[in-house]
Curated annotation (Swiss-Prot):
InterPro entries recorded: DNA-dir_RNA_pol_insert, DNA-dir_RNA_pol_RpoA/D/Rpb3, DNA-dir_RpoA, RBP11-like, RNAP_asu_C, RNApol_insert_sf
Its biological purpose: DNA-dependent RNA polymerase catalyzes the transcription of DNA into RNA using the four ribonucleoside triphosphates as substrates.
SUPFAM superfamilies per the UniProt record, alphabetical: C-terminal domain of RNA polymerase alpha subunit (SSF47789), Insert subdomain of RNA polymerase alpha subunit (SSF56553), RBP11-like subunits of RNA polymerase (SSF55257)
BP terms from Gene Ontology: DNA-templated transcription
Keywords: Cytoplasm, DNA-directed RNA polymerase, Nucleotidyltransferase, Transcription, Transferase
Domain remarks: The N-terminal domain is essential for RNAP assembly and basal transcription, whereas the C-terminal domain is involved in interaction with transcriptional regulators and with upstream promoter elements.
EC number, UniProt record: 2.7.7.6
CC annotations in GO: cytoplasm; DNA-directed RNA polymerase complex; nucleoid
Protein name (Swiss-Prot/TrEMBL): DNA-directed RNA polymerase subunit alpha
Pfam family, one: RNA_pol_L
Biological classification of the source: Bacteria, Bacillati, Actinomycetota, Actinomycetes, Kitasatosporales
Highest taxon, organism lineage: Bacteria
Length: 340
């Protein structure tokens, strides 16, 4: 069985709707294999929502104008295509817009039903004069990729229903690059950097997760041909290996004071792993182990990125130490000895 080092994935947030994802180390050649697959999936296969058709009061087709509206219907449709919406419904839903002039008509004037949200309310849709009036229905559906107005046109649809181009994808832009990275003495491993920019309807990390899920489902089809076939197994991640090493350390490595060290040894706590399995309350049950010893242990563990087992809500180690009669400064029956 061949075992490769498990890559790690980290996210560098550029802004709310743009992130860079770094995957490393990858076996030589896998950077481009994975990067190209992720990019194509992100651009074409992430589910989203979009307006698929509209109906404007008093309008029969798109090649006309609306009285009192500066923009013609074609320009109005171009503006509507820039709407960023999300929908929780699997079936088509209708949003309504009613506005009396004069003034601008924006996406904020749209009244969406429950489960539908307009994410760019400042988008200007039309301009009305003093006599202008705009009443419109907008049908929203879920889908993926791009669907043209011709494809959205339904057989036998009502007169006045105007299909529009639908851009379902919540992803605006995806780029990737592959760099060399080093693992021990080898310098030919791949480092994949994927830059993802999305619309306001979805965060980049959610789009990345959706792409990963889709690819796993598709590649699973090949795996099902023979689930016992040999492949390259991923070993433990570097983080997991480092954590295991830290937990295996003897408590001598923490360089605690003699008092704290001896108390822990008498309790049978010999490793960091055994220590983090105890809560503050557990440690205060140990004779002569008080609040100052608790603070010392917590500080040492924090330096390693570790912590004690969760204590009960509202737990105060100082008050508990007083209740137990533990005092780190003096104890008549306690004799300090050197570490052994």
């Amino acid at each position: 069985m061949l075992i490769a080092q498990r890559p790690s994935l980290t996210e560098e947030v550029v802004d709310e709707f743009r992130s860079r994802f770094v995957i490393e180390p990858l076996e030589p050649g896998f950077g481009y294999t994975l990067g190209n697959s992720l990019r194509r999936t992100l651009l074409s296969s992430i589910p989203g929502a979009a307006v698929t058709s509209i109906r404007i009061d008093g309008v029969l087709h798109e090649f006309t104008t609306v009285p009192g509206v500066k923009e013609d219907v074609t320009d109005l449709i171009l503006n509507i295509k820039q709407l960023v919406v999300s929908s929780e419904h699997d079936e088509p839903v209708v949003m309504y817009l009613r506005k009396q002039g004069p003034g601008l008509v924006t996406a904020a004037d749209i009244a969406p039903p429950a489960g539908v949200e307009v994410h760019n309310p400042d988008l200007v849709l039309a301009t009305l004069n003093g006599k202008g009036k705009l009443e419109m229905e907008l049908t929203v559906e879920r889908g993926r990729g791009y669907v043209s107005a011709v494809q959205n046109k339904q057989v036998g649809q009502e007169i006045g229903r105007i299909p529009v181009d639908s851009i379902y994808s919540p992803v605006l832009k995806v780029t990737y690059k592959v760099e060399a990275t080093r693992v021990e003495q080898r310098t030919d491993f791949d480092k994949l950097i994927v830059d993802v920019e999305t619309k306001q309807a979805m965060r980049p990390r959610d789009a990345m997760a959706s792409a990963g899920k889709t690819l796993v489902e598709l590649f699973g089809l090949a795996r099902e041909l023979n689930i016992d076939a040999e492949g390259i197994d991923m070993g433990p991640s570097p983080t997991d290996a480092a954590l295991a090493a830290d937990l295996a350390l003897p408590i001598e490595e923490l360089e605690l004071t003699v008092r704290s060290y001896n108390c822990l040894k008498r309790e049978g706590i010999h490793s960091v792993g055994e220590l983090v399995a105890r809560s503050e309350a557990d440690l205060l049950d140990i004779r002569n182990f008080g609040a100052k010893s608790i603070d010392e242990v917590k500080a040492k563990l924090a330096g390693m990125g570790l912590a004690l087992k969760d204590s009960p809500p509202g737990f105060d180690p100082t008050a508990a130490a007083d209740a137990f009669g533990a005092d780190d400064d003096a104890d008549a029956g306690f004799v300090e000895t050197e570490q052994y």
